[in-house]
Swiss-Prot record:
Has the structural arrangement of an alpha-helix connected to antiparallel beta-sheets by disulfide bonds (CS-alpha/beta). Pfam families: Toxin_3. Alpha toxins bind voltage-independently at site-3 of sodium channels (Nav) and inhibit the inactivation of the activated channels, thereby blocking neuronal transmission. This toxin is active against insects (para/tipE). The modification Arginine amide is found at R83. The keyword Glycoprotein does not apply. This is Alpha-insect toxin BjaIT. Keywords: Amidation, Disulfide bond, Ion channel impairing toxin, Neurotoxin, Secreted, Signal, Toxin, Voltage-gated sodium channel impairing toxin. It is found in: Secreted. Its main location: secreted. Residues 1-19 form the signal peptide. One of its GO terms (molecular function) is toxin activity.
């Protein structure tokens, strides 16, 4: 019985945990993807591993793409200046 617990624990550690988050997708300069349509954002978000995405009109960063369940490896917009503009 103890072996079963140890094996299950080892498998859990080996598989890793992939989490996601809802956020504004950003480029490498901390600039949110600007948008005009939901289809553009959905394409960009899903291309980067999110479940879906839409254009957030007049949001915190203007008209920007909001992604649902975006992987941790994809950069998101963080507070501070957009260094590209």
């Amino acid at each position: 019985m103890n072996y079963l617990v140890v094996i299950c624990f080892a498998l859990l550690l080996m598989t890793g945990v992939e989490s996601g988050r809802d956020a504004y997708i950003a480029d490498n300069l901390n600039c949110a993807y600007t948008c005009g349509s939901n289809s553009y954002c959905n394409t960009e978000c899903t291309k980067n591993g999110a479940v879906s995405g839409y254009c957030q009109w007049l949001g915190k960063y203007g008209n920007a793409c909001w992604c649902i369940n975006l992987p941790d490896k994809v950069p998101i917009r963080i507070p501070g200046a957009c260094r590209g503009r």
